[in-house]
Swiss-Prot record:
Entry annotated with the keyword Amino-acid biosynthesis: no
Region annotation Disordered: where it falls in the sequence: 247-285, 301-354
Keyword Signal among UniProt keywords: yes
Superkingdom of origin organism: Bacteria
Pfam families: VWA
Positions with biased composition (Basic and acidic residues): 247-256, 273-284, 301-310, 329-342
Protein name: Uncharacterized protein YojO
Encoding gene, per UniProt annotation: yojO
SMART domains the record matches: VWA
Keywords for the protein's UniProt record, in alphabetical order: Signal
Ranges for domain VWFA: 445-632
Signal peptide range: 1-31
């Protein structure tokens, strides 16, 4: 069970999502992702921008500026670089140079400085970000220069001095004295560095590095010890042949996110219909026959390799290669021409977030309650009986008060015909209300309970709080469901992640007098995929007609599942935001058996915002839940 960590620090998920959106916007590609790494660079094959951990442990403003500068350099700046020259440079250093690390870092430093100037010309609003970046780097390299000189690490010291010279405000600033043979090279080095700000292409930067290395190969005795800038060893020649940020073949998005309710089994009736290749949505004619875009409809269960997007070179009369063979009776299972069925993931794809692409739900029905569970439930219900009665009385009094409220002479409502009071009274009451207030609470609740293994020492008291919710909501006739969720660790694979949902109290039976003992069936299980569970409950609640919808998540705040550790907090935060956009209020109840650390509180607030309730002593859970439930029910009455 882990929080997402950024070099042993908890990540601000809102900042991470902001940087992700920034990268996607600047690259104009949904395929691009961002991730934290040791050094900053762009991987064109993964379509991933890596941001350096160098910016950690700084003031929030400085950290944000540093991370943004990495995103600017890799998303906007990479377009100014030539990947062909990157490939040529890597080939040259492996064949001719001795000090490869120094050459690669020098190349990336000079190229970053060049593309930084290009970005500032294209987007002047980035100047303050790069100014902060330069200030932080100059402080860092000042310390590193002193340290390297004291330890006689002259290659690293020379690199730090080169950075200082390149970013100096005054042209009079010179390279410091190091070693006699290096000092003799100082005029030559400074002369070459003057060419950097005149370079307008990657090729010219490469030429400067080659000229510098020709001279420095004779005076340097060791390669660099530290890594300040990073050039990954990738197949840049191949990367240059494909789109830089976009996917090579990208299917158009549907106008609505609809999934077919039933998968096809191959026995459906097939109706042949003519479909014209031109229609009113066609913007421009094309030379290709039978080429069109589908923008409306539902997602099918076709295999991902069963079709491809058409190319302009495709022709209507192209030949098709197939094969046939004699079969026994009607057994066609061994025909070579038929494509063998591939193992397809059971998940719903990207509809539930990219981190849950291969997750799929398994809903469990509650078992009939045993005598032990019924006895345990009665004991729990007795402990919260006073809370439940107080809530019921409060709700009944509030509803009765609304009924007896005057329906005329109000400050808001329908305008009556007694308008003279507008001129004769200082605070006139000119409105009335026609309809009678409803005697029912127009609200619905879902209680989502984390059943991961980390809840083993909190589950008993959690059940007690859930019993309070259930009895209170049942007494005032508010429909609700109680669902425990977990992921099966043993059966989870890279392309199949079963997630179990144990609906111990469904909506349809939540108000029955005998409902409740099934709550005792909630037990700590294995892992938890919080973001996926919230999305599944959101779908179910959207089918409800009640005006107020509340989703209460009981957890210990540690989302962790197969392949979910790195981005679990970000995915959960995205799921919460999506639910709130659809009118569902999501509230987290954080459970603990000890004092809650500030880092834990920050992490929970990153996921759920200000709608987080912290319970440092789980034994006091009913005392915490009572005012919450009171407030939510009072809000539902309006």
């Amino acid at each position: 069970m882990k929080f997402i960590k950024f070099n042993d620090s908890t990540i601000d998920s809102f900042l991470f999502m902001m940087l992700t959106d920034l990268a996607k916007t600047l690259t104009k590609s949904e395929a691009v992702e961002v991730e934290y790494g040791v050094q900053s660079y762009y991987n064109p094959f993964e379509k991933k921008i890596y941001m350096s951990h160098f910016w950690k442990d700084r003031a929030a403003e400085d950290m944000e500026a540093g991370l943004k500068s990495d995103v600017y350099l890799r998303s906007v700046g990479t377009r100014y670089s030539s990947l062909h020259e990157f490939a040529n440079f890597l080939n040259d250093i492996h064949r001719h140079l001795t000090f490869k690390s120094f050459a690669k870092q020098l190349f990336m430093l000079l190229e970053d400085i060049r593309i930084e100037e290009c970005i500032k010309r294209e987007r002047p609003g980035t100047k303050h970000v790069f100014a902060k970046r330069k200030d932080m780097y100059r402080k860092h390299f000042s310390t590193q220069l002193t340290l390297n000189l004291e330890r006689s690490i002259f290659t690293d010291a020379l690199f730090c001095a080169i950075y200082f010279k390149l970013t100096a405000e005054s042209p009079l600033e010179t390279l410091p004295s190091m070693r006699e043979d290096i000092d003799l090279m100082r005029p030559f080095i400074e002369q070459q560095l003057l060419r950097v700000y005149e370079a307008d292409s990657t090729r010219q930067v490469l030429k400067i590095v080659e000229d510098l290395m020709d001279g420095l190969e004779e005076v340097l005795d060791k390669d660099m010890l530290n890594t300040y800038f990073f050039l990954p060893e990738l197949d840049y020649a191949k990367a240059a042949e494909q789109p830089l940020f976009e996917e090579e073949k990208k299917a158009p998005k549907l106008s609505d996110d609809i999934t077919l309710p039933k998968q096809s089994d191959g026995d459906e009736d097939i109706h042949e219909e003519e479909m014209p290749t031109w229609h009113r949505e066609t913007e421009a004619p094309s030379k290709s026959f039978l080429q069109f875009d589908i923008e409306h409809g539902a997602k099918s269960d076709l295999g991902k390799d069963a079709s491809r997007e058409g190319d302009d070179g495709d022709q209507a009369l192209g030949s098709v290669q197939g094969s046939a063979r004699q079969t026994k009776r009607k057994d066609y299972s061994k025909l070579e021409a038929l494509e063998s069925q591939k193992d397809q993931p059971n998940g719903a794809g990207m509809a539930d977030g990219k981190e849950n692409k291969y997750a799929f739900p398994i809903y469990k029905e509650p078992q009939p309650a045993t005598s032990e569970e019924e006895l345990s439930y009665k004991q729990q219900a007795k402990t919260i009986e006073s809370y439940q009665k107080r809530l019921k009385q409060m709700i009944q009094k509030t509803l009765e008060h609304k009924k007896t409220l005057p329906r005329t002479d109000l400050h808001a409502g329908r305008l009556n015909n007694k308008l003279l009071r507008y001129f004769t009274e200082r605070n006139p009451r000119l409105f009335y209300k026609k309809q009678e207030p409803s005697s029912e609470i127009d609200a619905v609740f879902t209680l989502l309970v984390d059943c991961s293994a980390s809840m083993f020492d909190k589950m008993d008291e959690t059940k007690r709080g859930i019993v309070l919710f259930h009895e209170a909501l049942k007494s005032v006739a508010v429909p609700h469901q109680i669902v425990g969720f977990w992921e099966d660790t043993n059966d989870a694979t890279e392309k199949s992640q079963p997630n179990y949902f144990n609906t111990v109290i469904p909506f349809q039976s939540s108000l029955r007098q005998d409902s409740g003992p099934a709550i005792m069936q909630l037990e700590p299980e294995e892992d938890n995929r919080d973001g996926y569970a919230i999305r599944q409950m959101t779908k179910k609640m959207l089918h409800r007609s009640e005006a107020q919808k509340f989703l209460i998540v009981f957890s210990d705040g540690e989302p962790a599942a197969f392949g979910y550790e790195q981005n679990g907090i970000v995915d959960t935060s995205e799921a919460v935001i999506e639910a709130r956009k659809r009118g569902i209020e999501v509230i987290n109840v954080f459970l603990s058996n000890s004092e809650i650390e500030e880092s834990q509180m920050k992490t929970i607030q990153d996921m759920y915002g200000k709608f987080s309730i912290f319970v440092p002593d789980v034994d006091q859970l009913p005392d915490v839940l009572y005012p919450l439930l009171k407030k939510l029910l009072h809000k539902s009455i309006g």
